[in-house]
């Protein structure tokens, strides 16, 4: 009933808007021309010429009509979605590194972290986004303690994205439909601006309702339905020409029955006996959890940029983000879920961040300096609790209520300072930077005495880490067309709470029962070299061609990794040597090398545009992940297969029409740790076959109906069966025809 009412309201307001705008005079300003830019990474943007950076603008985002943020940026070279297609089952992999601590995710500048077992790590609604920036690698002193793979910055929409010149009040309505899972998306916005144009307000809401996805063979990915609601409030206040204050608030909820492991695909069917005993509905739900997920994000930014004072460009930011997942199994579920968060669980991850920095610009003789200095304070909190009804009568398990031993509670505090000087001399830019981090890890004792026995090493005491990171960069503009660059960084990270304080019960058959207070910092040296060629007016007036090539080499040391397999040097040769009685659940492996290359070519003109990209990554550990004392190197399982993308399209500016084709070609992946260590199956992913996917897209803004836009996107045009390697062979989705109709007022 609510959906029917929403549809009627949407159609009514759209028709009213058409009548108000059908006779409006067309705007021929540059902002209207921006609507015609191709739906690819925009090569005209100077920020996209930075080494290692990929940018998706609003038109890219809207044209894809992606269901989740990870799938949205999967088109970028070196960036891959990992996991399956169920709601909340996606993570990111950048150049072969995919752990949550390796990929830093920010929403409007707020750090977001979530590392729940077998779950995704990002829950950002694409409908809210206006821009996504991916900086590959860790080459900036503004970021420390991890993020080796890179930083993904999601930026939400703002009032200026909807208002025309001199417009004081505006609105937005959008309806979307996907054929594969019968998804319906409703988005609406109210935009306000005062007479002085120094205060604006955006209220934005989106609802996403979808059924189960279908595989290419038309079978359903069971329990992949999506019921999601998201809201955004953003205020900009230009207090004076020198002072700007921005507040953004994002809130999202998702509820529904789904498998505990959202990243997985195949769900075992209930037995015929269970169906006869409980009925089909309850029999299925005994294998599921009812998930209640909430995601919050608050950011307050202040900028002070006085006129005629190059020494001050002050920026401060205070942010808070919180993600909660409460899972409940049905009453008739069996009490055997200790390893999957019990019969009920309450999980909360939160991040509190404060950053203040200033950039001073000055000259020393013939060199120009941009000196950045900043301070940071961060607090990451993980609160975990589960209820296991099989332990309800056991005192040593706190009568069923305790923290999962593999997902401990705790806090991590980071205090940091950073400094960078960017020096420009003629056509050379040299940058050097340093960063100091002091980190405090504080564990929380488990409610269950079973996991609080100091005699077997279950110690939740505070552990401190500190150290410096170093950054160097060089960019040489050979001429107007060619730029060469190289970067180097030496950075480190402390263990996250899981790695420091995970334990096992004291009656465990093996000696690996302790927390891991003896862990050392994980170190990495990162190097990249490359070049950028930019040619303007190549074939016709106002066209642009850009070619970029990058090679990177990452050398990691003291990799923090779970202790399984060979537990001590004494039995490294698989002898019967007895190890010490207390061994931590995590240890430092000797090291690894990840290297690769990216080739990118983009062309855009008034009428034609296209792109070709290619990314290649390979990586090896010095030893087996299960035997750090071995002499045989092994492939790293999380390295993605080679990927190439291509796109070709055209614009008809007279009719505000854009259409094109995009394809993705993925090689097979058969490199596995098993080839170096046949017993390393636990750390391996199934081999995958290569595949190609073809998509079509179309965008049209009728000239006579100002503010209206129609988009059509067809994913997997040929309904090709495929199983992405990083999805652990979870099936891809079948052909999906996406349609959206939007109206700005």
Swiss-Prot record:
Residues 1-24 form the signal peptide. The keyword Chloroplast does not apply. GO terms for molecular function: heme transmembrane transporter activity; siderophore uptake transmembrane transporter activity. Gene3D superfamilies: TonB-dependent receptor, beta-barrel domain, TonB-dependent receptor, plug domain. Pfam families: Plug, TonB_dep_Rec_b-barrel. Heme receptor. This is TonB-dependent heme receptor A. It comes from Haemophilus influenzae (strain 86-028NP). The gene is tdhA.
């Amino acid at each position: 009933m609510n959906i029917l009412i929403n549809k009627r309201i949407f159609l009514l307001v759209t028709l009213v808007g058409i009548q108000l705008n059908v006779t409006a005079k067309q705007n021929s300003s540059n902002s209207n021309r921006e609507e015609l830019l191709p739906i690819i990474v925009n090569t005209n943007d100077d920020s996209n010429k930075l080494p290692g950076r990929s940018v998706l603008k609003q038109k890219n985002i809207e044209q894809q009509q992606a269901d989740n943020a990870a799938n949205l940026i999967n088109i970028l070279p070196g960036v891959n979605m990992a996991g399956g297609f169920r709601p909340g089952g996606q993570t990111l992999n950048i150049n072969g590194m995919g752990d949550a601590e390796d990929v830093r995710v920010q929403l409007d500048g707020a750090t977001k972290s979530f590392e729940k077992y077998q779950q995704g790590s990002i829950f950002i609604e694409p409908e809210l986004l206006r821009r996504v920036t991916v900086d590959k690698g860790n080459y900036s002193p503004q970021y420390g303690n991890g993020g080796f793979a890179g930083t993904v910055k999601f930026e939400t929409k703002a009032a200026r994205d909807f208002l025309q010149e001199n417009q004081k009040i505006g609105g937005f309505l959008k309806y979307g439909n996907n054929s594969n899972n019968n998804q319906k998306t409703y988005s609406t916005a109210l935009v306000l601006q005062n007479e002085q144009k120094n205060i604006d307000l955006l209220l934005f809401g989106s609802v996403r309702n979808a059924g189960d996805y279908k595989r290419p063979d038309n079978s359903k990915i069971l329990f992949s339905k999506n019921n999601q609601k998201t809201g955004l409030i953003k205020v900009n206040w230009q207090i004076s020409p020198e002072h700007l204050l921005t507040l953004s608030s994002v809130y999202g909820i998702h509820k529904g029955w789904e498998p505990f492991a959202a990243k997985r695909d195949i769900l075992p069917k209930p037995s015929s006996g269970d169906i006869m005993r409980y009925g089909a509905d309850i029999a299925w739900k005994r294998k599921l959890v009812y998930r209640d997920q909430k995601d919050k994000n608050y950011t307050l930014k202040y900028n002070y940029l006085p006129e005629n004072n190059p020494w001050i460009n002050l920026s401060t930011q205070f942010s808070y983000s919180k993600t909660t997942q409460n899972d409940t199994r049905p009453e008739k579920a069996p009490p055997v879920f200790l390893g999957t968060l019990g019969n009920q669980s309450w999980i909360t991850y939160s991040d509190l961040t404060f950053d203040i920095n200033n950039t001073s610009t000055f000259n020393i003789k013939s060199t120009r300096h941009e000196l950045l200095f900043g301070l940071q304070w961060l607090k990451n909190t993980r609160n975990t609790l589960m209820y296991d009804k099989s332990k309800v009568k056991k005192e040593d398990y706190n009568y069923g209520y305790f923290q999962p031993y593999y997902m401990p509670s705790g806090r991590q505090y980071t205090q940091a300072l950073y400094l960078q000087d960017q020096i420009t001399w003629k056509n050379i830019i040299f940058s050097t930077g340093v960063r100091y981090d002091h980190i405090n890890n504080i564990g929380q004792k488990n409610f269950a005495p079973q996991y609080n026995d100091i005699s077997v090493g279950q110690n939740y005491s505070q552990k401190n880490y500190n150290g410096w990171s170093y950054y160097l960069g060089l960019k040489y503009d050979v001429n107007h067309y060619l730029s060469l660059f190289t970067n180097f960084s030496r950075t480190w990270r402390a263990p996250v709470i899981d790695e420091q304080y995970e334990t096992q019960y004291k009656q465990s058959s093996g000696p690996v029962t302790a927390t891991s207070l003896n862990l050392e910092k994980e170190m990495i040296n990162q190097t990249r070299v490359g070049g950028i060629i930019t040619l303007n007016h190549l074939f016709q007036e106002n066209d642009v061609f850009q070619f970029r090539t990058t090679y990177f080499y990452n050398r990691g040391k003291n990799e923090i990794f779970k202790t399984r397999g060979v537990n001590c040097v004494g039995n490294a040769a698989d002898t019967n040597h007895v190890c010490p009685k207390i061994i931590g659940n995590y240890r430092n492996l000797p090291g690894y090398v990840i290297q690769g290359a990216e080739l990118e070519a983009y062309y855009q003109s008034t009428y034609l545009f296209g792109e070709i990209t290619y990314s290649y990554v390979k990586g090896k550990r010095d030893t087996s992940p299960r035997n750090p004392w071995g002499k045989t190197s092994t492939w790293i399982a999380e390295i993605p297969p080679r990927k190439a993308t291509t796109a070709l399209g055209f614009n008809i500016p007279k009719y505000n029409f854009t259409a094109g084709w995009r394809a993705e070609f993925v090689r097979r992946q058969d490199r596995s740790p098993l080839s170096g260590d046949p017993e390393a199956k636990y750390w391996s992913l199934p081999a995958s076959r290569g595949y190609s996917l073809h998509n079509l897209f179309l965008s049209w803004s009728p000239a006579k109906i100002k503010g209206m836009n129609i988009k059509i996107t067809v994913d997997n045009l040929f309904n090709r069966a495929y199983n992405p390697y990083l999805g652990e062979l979870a099936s891809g989705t079948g052909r999906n025809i996406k349609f959206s109709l939007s109206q700005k007022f």
